Amino acid sequence: MGFIVGVVIGLLVGIAIIIGFVKLENSRSKLRSELANTVAAFARMTVEDSRKLLPPEFYPSWVVFSERQKLTWLNHHLTKIWPYVDEAASELIKASVEPVLEQYRPAIVASLTFSKLTLGTVAPQFTGVSVIDGDKNGITLELDMQWDGNPNIVLGVKTLVGVSLPIQVKNIGFTGVFRLIFRPLVEDFPCFGAVSVSLREKKKLDFTLKVVGGDISAIPGLSEAIEETIRDAVEDSITWPVRKVIPIIPGDYSDLELKPVGMLEVKLVQAKNLTNKDLVGKSDPFAKMFIRPLREKTKRSKTINNDLNPIWNEHFEFVVEDASTQHLVVRIYDDEGVQASELIGCAQIRLCELEPGKVKDVWLKLVKDLEIQRDTKNRGEVHLELLYIPYGSGNGIVNPFVTSSMTSLERVLKNDTTDEENASSRKRKDVIVRGVLSVTVISAEEIPIQDLMGKADPYVVLSMKKSGAKSKTRVVNDSLNPVWNQTFDFVVEDGLHDMLVLEVWDHDTFGKDYIGRCILTLTRVIMEEEYKDWYPLDESKTGKLQLHLKWMAQSIYRDS
């Protein structure tokens, strides 16, 4: 009997082991199959699939997803035909750049021309291409190009004293993006009328200068002047939005040439919390602004001495040639007198972010380099008011001098492009927006503690920047959230160029302590005529003011 029971138990255990083994094998087989499918799926993944799976914050800094296609085939064929391209391109470059070199010729130079110009035997390498969508009437390509060539470029330089110097341009290293626009599309072969060529982005342009048979440093300042002239010539002859239009089929292609499309008006208001570049005292900041980095198109503000929170309140105008791609660049420098100015920080804003005909009030964070966006150091901020005014009667912006329904500032600031309207634009600069500004200081909140009792005795000093008119509120004792509800009226002679400054002070028996300030242009109140808002205190960790502003305008004109 025991034997039979043992046999039965053995059979049951054996069957259980077999069943368990089969299930384990099936499970392992299923896992292997799933793993194989997963590996196969990864093998089929595209770059776009990877970008969908992982958000950008998980990418290492060295991972870059390129949208460009490789051009090995083009580089192979370009190497073969380069001797012919060299000859044709050299003539084209000479014809395009030489007049611009003469235009930007330094004052110490009497003439500046090309004595020799060939591009050498090394062909450039195209590292990628992409197609830009959105143009129904043409095809736009962008080509990444890198060139470390051996060109033979000699400039014929004649100084004011009559000395001729052959200056060789050597060791050229260039990296950039070229834009080719095939437009307009036509029915005749090759199906486009012209090709527009432009340098869309200049990533790197390095070169050295050498006097043939001499030393360029023998003439102080000549090397720097020639180098700046070359860079300006490249910028003004081929860099976007400038383009070279090459007709393929005979026709009128004047519409493809560069034309101004609008005007950008910029009010440089102020900056705050700038990095101090001086070991003794404070920096002496000034600003440079440009849309295209050319000498005559770059605007410079006045220098504010010994101030890390400068107030400029200056107005500048810039011609816009392509609002969809151009941007305004602001660079803040520390004025070092006879020495080279030191960069404090820079910022930029794309013009496509501006709504035509509407004033945009922005604070831009300053960075060390616009190309590197990982700068976390606090370099300060700059305050701008921007107004983009497109040219042309079809842009929806009406002539400001014939529309009574617009606000005062809109009547002053908007213009069009006809001759009559351009005359109005010139007249606009002589407009004075005069009126009465009514300011009600309502209250403040979260004023910083100023005394040992954990309280403050705040009051507000109001002043007009241009006229110097001043008023002040009463003192509210022992309060970090004071309420004043006091109204002050200021007669403003030129509202477009004046500013309201409100300083908050702590009253003490034997003096006063500065807490913070608010600086307001009159742009918003002139446009809206009346509003109420909160304003944070600059130069203070906490605190804000609630104000009610009202404008009663009377626009007049200077006699001209």
UniProtKB/Swiss-Prot annotation:
Localisation: Membrane
Pfam families cross-referenced by the UniProt entry: C2 (PF00168), SMP_LBD (PF17047)
Organism domain of life: Eukaryota
Positions contributing to Ca(2+) 2 binding: 451, 457, 506, 508
Cofactor(s), names only, from the UniProt record: Ca(2+)
Residues the record lists as binding Ca(2+) 3: 451, 506, 508, 513
GO molecular function: lipid binding; metal ion binding
InterPro entries: C2_dom, C2_domain_sf, SMP_LBD, Synaptotagmin_plant, Synaptotagmin_SMP
Binding site for Ca(2+) 1: 278, 284, 334, 336
Residue intervals of the C2 domain: 243-364, 417-535
Membrane topology classification: Single-pass membrane protein
GO biological process, alphabetically ordered: lipid transport
SUPFAM superfamilies with a match to the protein in the record: C2 domain (Calcium/lipid-binding domain, CaLB)
This protein's UniProt keywords: Calcium, Lipid transport, Lipid-binding, Membrane, Metal-binding, Repeat, Transmembrane, Transmembrane helix, Transport
CDD domains cross-referenced by the UniProt entry: C2, SMP_SYT
GO cellular component: endomembrane system; endoplasmic reticulum; membrane; perinuclear theca; plasmodesma
Annotated transmembrane regions: 2-22
Chain positions covered by the region annotation Phospholipid binding: 227-523
Segments forming domain SMP-LTD: 67-249
PANTHER family for this protein: EXTENDED SYNAPTOTAGMIN-RELATED (PTHR10774), SYNAPTOTAGMIN-5 (PTHR10774:SF149)
Cited function: May be involved in membrane trafficking.
Family classification: Belongs to the synaptotagmin family.
Name of this protein: Synaptotagmin-5
Annotated organism of origin: Arabidopsis thaliana (Mouse-ear cress)
